[in-house]
UniProtKB/Swiss-Prot annotation:
Key word Ion transport present: yes
Localization terms from the record: Mitochondrion inner membrane
Name of the protein this chain belongs to: ATP synthase subunit H, mitochondrial
Subunit structure: F-type ATP synthases have 2 components, the catalytic core F(1) and the membrane-embedded component F(0), linked together by a central stalk and a peripheral stalk. The central stalk, also called rotor shaft, is often seen as part of F(1). The peripheral stalk is seen as part of F(0). F(0) contains the membrane channel next to the rotor. F-type ATP synthases form dimers but each monomer functions independently in ATP generation.
GO molecular function, one term: proton-transporting ATP synthase activity, rotational mechanism
Record function comment: Mitochondrial membrane ATP synthase (F(1)F(0) ATP synthase or Complex V) produces ATP from ADP in the presence of a proton gradient across the membrane which is generated by electron transport complexes of the respiratory chain. F-type ATP synthases consist of two structural domains, F(1) - containing the extramembraneous catalytic core, and F(0) - containing the membrane proton channel, linked together by a central stalk and a peripheral stalk.
Upper classification of the organism: Eukaryota, Fungi, Dikarya, Ascomycota, Saccharomycotina
GO cellular component, as recorded: mitochondrial inner membrane; proton-transporting ATP synthase complex
Main location: mitochondrion
The family this protein is said to belong to: Belongs to the ATPase h subunit family.
Pfam families tied to this protein: ATP_sub_h (PF10775)
Membrane topology term: Peripheral membrane protein
Gene (name only): ATP14
Length: 89
């Protein structure tokens, strides 16, 4: 077979170049130690910031209880919709 002969001939003629240390050095990056983690700085550190947080007013939204109590029915949360079955022919 002609194709097989050409393939074998090319395989025998192939001479790979040996890899040198310079090739390996060019293909990789040198390893370096990562930077040490920094301690996060909080905005307004100190006792005065804590006191300000403690004295801050809490915002609360109140719903009117009368309308919600009238509209609530405990049986409404688990209702199946009735499906009309097609007539049998």
């Amino acid at each position: 077979n002609l194709v097989t002969d050409l393939y074998v001939k090319e395989l025998k003629a192939f001479k790979p170049t040996p890899a040198s240390a310079a090739d390996a050095e060019a293909a990789t990056k040198p390893w370096k130690l990562p930077q040490a983690a920094k301690v996060p700085s909080l905005e307004g550190e100190g006792a005065d910031a804590l006191a300000e947080y403690d004295s801050a007013k809490v915002e609360v939204v109140e719903a009117s209880g009368e309308t919600a109590a009238e509209e609530y029915n405990p049986d409404d949360w688990f209702v199946f919709e009735e499906e009309e079955e097609p007539g049998h022919h």
